[in-house]
Amino acid sequence: MRVTPRMWIGFVVFVGYCATIVLITKLVGVPYPEIGKSAEATFKGAVLPIGVGALLLVITATALGWWRPALFERRRSPRRWPIVAPVIMVVVALVNLVSTDWSQFDAAFLLSLVGLGVFVGFSEEMMSRGLVLTAFRSRLREGWAWLLSSLLFGLMHLLNVALGAPFSSTIAQVAIAFGSGTAFYVLRRVTGSLIAAMVLHGLWDVSVFAVGFAPKGTVFATLVAPVIAALSLAVVYWVIKGTNENPISHASTSAHAAA
């Protein structure tokens, strides 16, 4: 690592990422409620700003030298069964995709949705459960690092109000995001890598936007989101228990071993 992880760096990454997304979205002038309703609105209102955010995160991770701790656990959770929460999330996402009337999408719209999934999956995970979690682990015990990084991930969705989203529905979105963020954290701990969480996050968002735009009928699967959130919160203790992923202590141990 070029730069020793510090907690304040996590807050700087969080604020910088959020500010970038809001600024670019405001500049392109696409209200949040329009995202997911057309190829142009989805590209300008989501793919473009989040893509720029992804580029900045790549630059930041490279400058800090944090790619390894951001993407990989030193030791994954010995308890595998909590993966049931993200597995249910995968099933719900697939049901959403099957429940979507894909005839309503042209090629440009499909490409925009794919771009949305790729950039959201990478950017939001790299920011919250990558760089921010790495920074928080340098100072906090694992339980607090999970809690604070997940809270910030949930609160980040309040920015949608500034972009035109209704406040009442956004509050619910914040709560669900905290729970789904916990599911992504559980997946990281169980698999030992952030990559699976990136893939699931992208798949989830694409499925929600797709079925929201062109449902074949009543969408029941998305209603399971609060259950997934609650289940994730119920099992997260078991992937936190006994965990020490402090990047500073591990770096010091490696240095002493090499000497």
Label each PLM-derived region with a short phrase.
Residues 123-148, 189-193:
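Membrane-interface helix/loop boundary segments of multi-pass membrane proteins
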Residues 22, 170-226:
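Functionally important transmembrane alpha-helices
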Residues 70, 202-259:
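C-terminal membrane module of polytopic membrane proteins
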Residues 97-107, 162-168, 213-220:
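Membrane-interface helix caps and helix-loop-helix hairpins in membrane proteins
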